[in-house]
Amino acid sequence: MSQPIYKRILLKLSGEALQGDEGFGIDPSILDRMALEIKGLLGLGVEVGVVLGGGNLFRGAKLAKAGMNRVVGDHMGMLATVMNGLAMRDALHRANVNAKLMSAFQLNGICDTYNWSEAIKMLCEKRVVIFSAGTGSPFFTTDSAACLRGIEIEADVVLKATKVDGVYDCDPVKNPNAVLYHKLSYAEVIEKELQVMDLAAFTLARDHNMPIRVFNMSKTGALRNVILGKTEGTLICD
C-alpha cells in the first residue's frame, strides 16, 4: 500500500462545500462522505486538523455592504462556523471517529475553547481536531484561520478543498478552456493575481513557508490521492 507523504495536515473546508446543490445549509450526505474520507486518512496514520467556513449559513461581509456593522457581521459568521463544526463533529462521531471541536472564543457547554498545547496533544492521540470561530477576531477570513492554525499545529500542508480541480489561469466556470496549474510558487500566484485565497491568508502562509494544496473535494477519493502524493489539484510552495 502507498504511504502518505504528509504526517499532519490542516484541511480547510468551505461552507459552500457542505451545502452541495442545496444552495444553503448543510447536505447530510456530503457531510457523511467527508467524515468517511477523513476517517480513511486516520487509517493511513495521518493526523488531521479541520477548519470550516460558514458561508453556507451566513456571510458577514455581504451584509456589511448592506449597512450592517462589519464587526457584528463577522461575529455572526464566526458563529456559523461553530454550527458547521458541530455538524462535522457529529458526523465524525457517527463514523466512529474520535473528534474534538474547539472554538476561538468561549462557548461553555457547547465546545472547548481553543488551546494550542491541548490541540497538539489530541492530534498526537490521532483525534481529529476541528477549529471553529475563525481566528476569533473580525476582519479575518476562515482562510486566514486555516493558515494560522496550520502554522500553529506545525502541519505539513494546508489543504484547501474547493469545488474546482485546483488553481486555473482564469475562472474555469466561465471559461471551459481555462488551464489548470499543477504547481506554483508563492511569487507566481501574486504575480499572476491568481485567486487562491485572500492576500492576508496567503502572505501568512508564504512568510512561514506553509505549502498550500488546492483540490476538488467533491471528487470522491481526491483527498486520499493528495495524501498519497498522487497528481491532484495545485501545489503552491517555494
Curated annotation (Swiss-Prot):
Signal peptide: none
Catalysed reactions, semicolon-separated: UMP + ATP = UDP + ADP
InterPro entries, alphabetized: AceGlu_kinase-like_sf, Asp/Glu/Uridylate_kinase, Uridylate_kinase, Uridylate_kinase_bac
Disulfide bonds: none
Keyword Cytoplasm attributed: yes
Cellular compartments annotated: Cytoplasm
Reported function: Catalyzes the reversible phosphorylation of UMP to UDP.
Subunit field text: Homohexamer.
Name used for this protein in its record: Uridylate kinase
Organism, as annotated: Histophilus somni (strain 129Pt) (Haemophilus somnus)
